[in-house]
Amino acid sequence: LNENAWYKSNLRTTAIFDCYIRASEYEEAVRFGISSISSECDKRNFQAVIHIGTELLKDVPKTQDASEESVPNPFAEFMDAGAKFHVYYAVADAYRIYQDLSQSVYYYKKAYKILQQYSISEFTSIDTCRFFHRYSNACISAADYDDALIVLDYFKKYKGRNNFYDFIMYNRYSVVYLAINDIENALLSIDESLKIAKECKEPQWESVSYSDKAYIYYRAYEDKENTILYFSKAVEKHISEKATINRSAEILAQEAFVDLLTDKLEDAEYLADLALNRALEINGTAMEIKSRNLLGIIQYFSNKAEAAFSTWQKDLVISAQRVNKDGIVKLHTNLGAAYILQSKYVPAKEELEQAYALYQKFKVSPITHKPLIYNLLFIYNILGDTSKRDKLFEKAYFDNLSSYYNQLISGSENILTDGYWPLQFKHVFFNY
């Protein structure tokens, strides 16, 4: 749907549903609501799904100060366990793709409780595997890594997996292990995923595994050469005809990233723009945020600072609206990095400290956000705030950080950054 058609569809569907409620036609509201959830999911009209689904369930996450009193639900008598499961699942998926990832995990948990207790009519083993896949993705995206491991352990015990979902399960394990800095198991899991892909002669699966292997070398090992190698293999194995819209956007962005790391800035900008436009074909994907952030980085590296700041600021607004935790922290990190390069050290410090406060609040993966720590150490050092610098080093230690820190405290005018985080510009670190 284009934006205008999407808006009209959303307004029409939710207005009819609300009319049934105002008329106290609760059974009709349930009938229309469940039918509409299915059709609006197909249109990727997630706002309507969330509006209708949360109203039918009368179930929203409680804040710490909220009363524990249950809200009367006039729809409950007209929904059996199967209907409730499908509504919870639809709302969870809508939040996973479009809005608040933490909310998504909440509704997935509720859906899974029903799935454990009841046999859901016409919900096949493939449907169950797909549920675990999406549930684990929601946990990963929400930075709920403990929950992600629990879900994947459930998935591992499930006997209805086929080769594809064996591949998916090990792939998701690798992503979680990387996030929690268990690099040995991350590599074992991604290699198992890659082994399945090769045995099944599925190059598209290989492409996905190579992408995630590249992220291990990029984030854990800060290894530029192998980052380029495995992203290039992912691009080489990619089959566009078999790809989802989201995967198409991912592979375009990864190809752009390789061009960025190899100083092909014009090609990188072209591909990043393609990735963003591809992602925009889906209403509300996280890949939109990731692609726009990358585009901003490329613009900055191409001496288009004004365009880069505009791109990042737009991305920051959208990231905040959707509570994209990694996106928010990365964007503040990149704004801080850009200010460092402009010798605007006070706003650089403000951006980086805001990024660090959110990094702590969101409990996102330390492995993913090394550039934040490098840059914050640098800004504290240059501003003479040695107390904050030293405390941060003690708290945020990871491999490579000691040698960087030792260069800072030595007072050396020339900080050497070869062998550190691959994405850097004039010895300042950016995050994609």
Could you describe each region identified by the protein language model?
Residues 18, 34-42, 86-100, 127-143, ...:
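Tandem amphipathic alpha-helical repeat scaffolds
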Residues 7, 67-79, 120-125, 247, ...:
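Acidic, Ser/Thr-rich low-complexity linear motifs
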Residues 17, 37-38, 57-65, 72, ...:
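Amphipathic alpha-helical segments of tetratricopeptide repeats
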Residues 1-98, 103-107, 120:
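Extended alpha-helical scaffolding segments used for macromolecular assembly and cargo binding
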Residues 13, 26, 46, 101, ...:
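TPR-repeat structural position
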Residues 272-341, 345, 350-365, 369-371:
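Eukaryotic tandem repeat interaction scaffolds
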Residues 7, 11, 27, 82, ...:
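Residue signature of alpha-solenoid helical repeat architecture, marking inter-repeat boundaries
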